[in-house]
């Protein structure tokens, strides 16, 4: 309907029930007024002013709106709703222009907000189909800047600034808000198309009809000023839902990337790439706008963030996503033996898969073992909706979960599974841990357990909480327990100098308050503490053993010599070197080694790295009776190096530490991964 050079311009102005002016549309308030005027560009004539009052769904006007517009709530009760008001607008413009074959018109607004931030978002929420004329428009501010480059900055430009630049006198003809702006815009347009400017309105702004999916290469250069992060999305939302939330703004092709958590499930965040910085800035104004009943937070992000989620290099994925305008559905929970024929039979004739077998992409681990996930292409929305109705139907003996997916999610899932499994396979331990000769009796209840601590509690808070009993804590005797996410669990264990002092501390400190929370204090033994720190649970019904103590359904596939108590390097990096070199086992000194599979649970609970005055031993690492001894380096420290070049040698590492004090007897321990190394350093603890 819109030609490159239209015959008519329709000046359009909107008013909302909330903020107006530069903040128009930022508060999600509904439209309450439409004003427009038709301008004949060929004859340079301005038509009559038209005005329609619109009844919003929520008849509430802000005080600012009432003051500026002089509109009262009573004026809106008999007004038409937005859909009827837009029909009146379309019919009025058509009648006035007497549109025939070859006649064209285009909307013209003061800035981007009226169309992009008001009409399109509200119409999308109310499922109103906007006329085609609202998908292209002229931004009078931009056109004015092209015609008059010496005018004010576009961010400071408005109707009054443009009128002042052209020397118009201020009019007082209209008292209704918006009417004077429409009059001034008409005069400005007529002036621009007349002598001496003779400006032609061409190449209008475009609003995308729909979001286009696509792929993104990791090698692509992306402008940081075009990326936002949306947070708080419903877990079932798709890229189309994101595009609908940002309706009116142009998202780049394939520019909506849903983020996944460590388990491969959506975490409620998405990274969105827009076509320009201007559209990104408008998107930021939708911070805390609503998607259904949830408000969405919108923040700036970087191109690097986007590439981590949406970027990919797999030719298989690129070929799978090469078919455009396809709806992607993700299947989860497939039998590991499922074939493409079984997937096609699962969907049946009601929802045919695009391209048959070529429209199915199975997700596999690096060794080609199936993960139970697959992505399927459908040619249209109808087929996809029919497919989603099969959610939790059976394929074989397993029920299948179905979700709408995106091209970016395909890339992300394939990248995640092809690079490494979600749960790393256990690796052989490599760091010897020397046991301390002293082993405390397990039946002595010389420990106390604090339960219900504030999550922000520190060791200093605990010492203050215990008061006089803090003097009875063993050296390095405070154990802060972390959960499997590495965050404080609200529990702590304290080793006291005697069972009597532990008993008195439990009696006098039980249910005392710490930062407005009462804390429970129980007397316990070293054995009970050891069980909890290994991942077991301690409750009033007794001890629940940690995962690594549960009966094995099948023996481990491999074992390692039990020459020394050992921990994996991933766990070792969490602790101070003194903890690794001077351990104290709370287990009997019988030779013991947990199978490699048990190491998966070692981080279920962990020590908080304590300063001097807290524990110096790792009680849940079992010790062997016949361990070969080595002089402890009490003043040394362990350094872990990550990210080394694969061709790095010992000389390169020693040169790197030039200037630090290390002695020839310091140990250099290679790790299985060639890009890692450990160096014992006598003075400092450095993590690289």
Curated annotation (Swiss-Prot):
- Return one GO MF term: mRNA binding
Kindly provide the name given to this protein in its UniProt entry: Epithelial splicing regulatory protein 1
Q: Which UniProt keywords apply?
A: mRNA processing, mRNA splicing, Nucleus, Repeat, RNA-binding
Asked whether the keyword Repeat is assigned, the reply is: yes
- Residue ranges occupied by any RRM domain in the UniProt entry: 226-303, 327-407, 446-526
A GO-annotated cellular component: ribonucleoprotein complex
Could you tell me the superkingdom of the organism this chain comes from? Eukaryota
The biological process GO terms on file are: mRNA processing; regulation of RNA splicing; RNA splicing
Q: Could you tell me where this protein is found in the cell?
A: Nucleus
What is the documented function of this protein?
mRNA splicing factor that regulates the formation of epithelial cell-specific isoforms. Specifically regulates the expression of FGFR2-IIIb, an epithelial cell-specific isoform of fgfr2. Acts by directly binding specific sequences in mRNAs. Binds the GU-rich sequence motifs in the ISE/ISS-3, a cis-element regulatory region present in the mRNA of fgfr2.
The text of the family note is: Belongs to the ESRP family.
The record, for SMART domains, names: RRM (SM00360)
Q: Which InterPro entries match?
A: ESRP, ESRP1_RRM1, Nucleotide-bd_a/b_plait_sf, RBD_domain_sf, RNaseH-like_sf, RNaseH_sf, RRM_dom
UniProt entry tagged with the keyword Zinc-finger: no
């Amino acid at each position: 309907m819109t030609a490159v050079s239209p015959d008519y311009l329709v000046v359009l102005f909107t008013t909302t029930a909330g903020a107006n002016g530069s903040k128009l549309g930022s508060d999600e308030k509904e439209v309450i007024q439409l004003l427009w005027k038709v301008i004949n560009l060929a004859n340079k004539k301005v038509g009559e002013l038209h005005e329609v009052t619109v009844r919003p769904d929520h008849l509430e006007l802000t005080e600012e709106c009432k003051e500026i517009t002089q509109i009262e709530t009573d004026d809106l009760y008999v007004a038409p709703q937005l859909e009827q008001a837009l029909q009146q607008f379309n019919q009025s413009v058509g009648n006035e222009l007497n549109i025939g074959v070859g006649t064209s018109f285009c909307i013209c607004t003061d800035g981007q907000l009226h169309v992009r931030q008001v009409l399109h978002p509200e119409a999308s929420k109310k499922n109103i189909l906007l006329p085609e004329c609202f998908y292209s428009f002229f931004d009078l501010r931009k056109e004015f800047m092209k015609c008059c480059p010496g005018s004010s900055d576009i961010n400071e430009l408005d109707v009054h600034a443009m009128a002042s630049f052209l020397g118009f006198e201020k009019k007082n003809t209209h008292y209704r808000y918006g009417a004077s702006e429409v009059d001034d815009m008409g005069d400005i347009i007529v002036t621009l198309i007349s002598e001496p400017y003779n400006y032609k309105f061409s190449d209008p702004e475009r609003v995308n009809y729909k979001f286009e999916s696509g792929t993104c290469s990791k090698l692509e250069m992306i402008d940081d000023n075009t990326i936002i992060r949306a947070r708080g999305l419903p877990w079932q939302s798709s890229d189309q839902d994101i595009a609908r939330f940002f309706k009116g703004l142009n998202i780049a092709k394939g520019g909506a990337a849903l983020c996944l958590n460590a388990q491969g499930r959506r975490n409620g965040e998405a990274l969105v790439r827009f076509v320009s910085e201007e559209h990104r800035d408008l998107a930021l104004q939708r911070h805390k706008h609503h998607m259904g009943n949830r408000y969405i937070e919108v923040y700036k992000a970087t191109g690097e963030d986007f590439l981590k989620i949406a970027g990919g290099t797999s030719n298989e994925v690129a070929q799978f996503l090469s078919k455009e305008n396809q709806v992607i559905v993700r299947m989860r929970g497939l039998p590991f033996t499922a074939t493409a024929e079984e997937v096609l039979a699962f969907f049946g004739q009601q929802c045919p898969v695009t391209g048959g077998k070529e429209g199915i992409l199975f997700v596999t681990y690096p060794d080609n073992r199936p993960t139970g996930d697959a992505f399927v292409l459908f040619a249209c929305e109808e087929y996809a909706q029919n497919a989603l109705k099969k959610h939790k139907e059976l394929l074989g003996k397993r029920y299948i979960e179905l979700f709408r997916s995106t091209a970016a999610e395909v890339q992300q899932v394939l990248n995640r599974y092809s690079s490494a499994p979600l749960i790393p396979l256990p690796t052989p331990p490599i760091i010897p841990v020397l046991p301390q000769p002293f082993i405390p009796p397990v039946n002595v209840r010389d420990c106390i357990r604090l339960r219900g601590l504030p999550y922000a509690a520190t060791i200093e808070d605990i010492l203050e909480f215990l008061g006089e009993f803090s003097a009875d804590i063993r050296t390095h005797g405070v154990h802060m327990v972390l959960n499997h996410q590495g965050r404080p669990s609200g529990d702590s264990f304290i080793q006291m100098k005697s069972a009597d002092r532990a008993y008195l501390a439990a009696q006098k400190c039980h249910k005392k308050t710490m930062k407005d929370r009462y804390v429970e204090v129980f007397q316990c033994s070293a054995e009970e503490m050891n069980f909890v720190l290994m991942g077991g649970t301690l409750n009033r019904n007794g001890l629940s053993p940690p995962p690594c103590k549960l009966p094995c359904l099948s023996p481990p596939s491999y074992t390692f010599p039990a020459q020394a108590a050992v921990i994996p390097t991933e766990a070792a990096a969490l602790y101070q070197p003194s903890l690794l070199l001077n351990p104290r086992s709370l287990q009997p000194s019988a030779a013991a080694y947990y199978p490699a599979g048990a190491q998966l649970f070692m981080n279920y609970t962990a020590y908080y790295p304590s300063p001097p005055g807290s524990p110096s031993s790792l009680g849940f690492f079992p010790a062997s009776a016949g361990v070969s001894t080595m002089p402890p380096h009490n003043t040394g420290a362990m350094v872990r190096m990550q990210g080394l070049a694969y061709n790095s040698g010992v000389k390169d590492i020693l040169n790197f530490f030039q200037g630090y004090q290390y002695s020839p007897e310091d140990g250099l321990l290679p790790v299985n991964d060639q890009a890692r190394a450990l160096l014992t350093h006598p003075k400092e603890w450095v993590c690289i």
